[in-house]
Amino acid sequence: MQTRGTQAGLHIPECSLSYAKTIIKLNDMSTLLRQHAEQQFAEELHELKKNEAYPVPENWEMSPQSVVTYLMGGTLKDGFVVTPKYIGNRRLMEIAVATLVTDRALLLYGLPGTAKSWVSEHIAAAISGNSTLIVQGTAGTGEEAIRYGWNYARLLAEGPTEGALVQTPVMKAMQEGKIGRIEELTRIGSDVQDTLITILSEKTLPIPELNREVQAVKGFNIIATANNRDKGVNDLSSALKRRFNTVILPLPDTIEEEVDIVRRRVESFEKVMELPAEKPALDEIRRVVTIFRELRQGATADGKTKLKSPSGTLSTAEAISVVNNGLAMAGYFGDGQIHASDLVSGILGAVVKDPVQDKVVWQEYMETVLKNRNGWKDIYRASREMM
């Protein structure tokens, strides 16, 4: 391990100096609305590297085993506790991380709100120490967002030169041996998507204007995300699909899993936003999650009553937003304690996307389920008032 001398003649490990600098930077970033994963969880990443016991692939920050521990949580040899970032099937995370050791890229696929972007960010943070090499896919994303672009003022003045070249996050990831991220891949036009084929198969990016190419350094790979239930998406070509290993992220299997996810994310949000409201009772979170799961699955939890499902996905991410909104309502326009009336407005906003069909779905749910369920009369009354 490299050391650096101090005036007192002490030798401090380079990793400790790096970690200390990171902590100083984090103190300066306390006013940020949202920190990157590598900033927010810098201590955990540092401890995992310090306790590393497995071989580390070239240009990775830690071993694949440690990356999975970072994602799933666990207790290290020295007793340090790593918090879980993903609550679900561990095998899915092992498959995702193992894919990135190979020459195939990773496609995280699933319904909106199933933590695809969240997992992508944390995998990149753990492997590369940098989750910011990202391309946000939209219908207007062009080839220059994936391959490279030009500073047109310099291009006109100098012609195609290195100084006029504008590097993309993908190009930087190739040169630095890091993980590049592409969000909402299927929102990008099919012709633009296919510019990835050469990058993923040949690991090169030709720049014919400069008569050269960029060759990927070991450690480079791509994580892409895509929704399987969305309007305005472009299917991947069969050639591009072959370059990806697809991992489907499902909705939480059990209500306990989903409640735990919502609770953890709400507590994190409350800490960052410093809301003047008390931590929501677990029962309130459970009620929101129960409503979402029942409407999503088209039946009550006991399976006795069939229900209509609304047009929206009612994902875990939306449940988190509903509780966060309820906290804000309680803190600024209530008594600081979260009540049914604070939650109902958010629930209605998530459920009633179509003002005609979804409204009917919610009204039927109110009258057949909420009205007759013990201890839920407050939500029923608040819903009636809002409707």
Language-model segments: residues:
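Conserved AAA+ ATPase small/helical "lid" subdomain
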Residues: V266-Q337
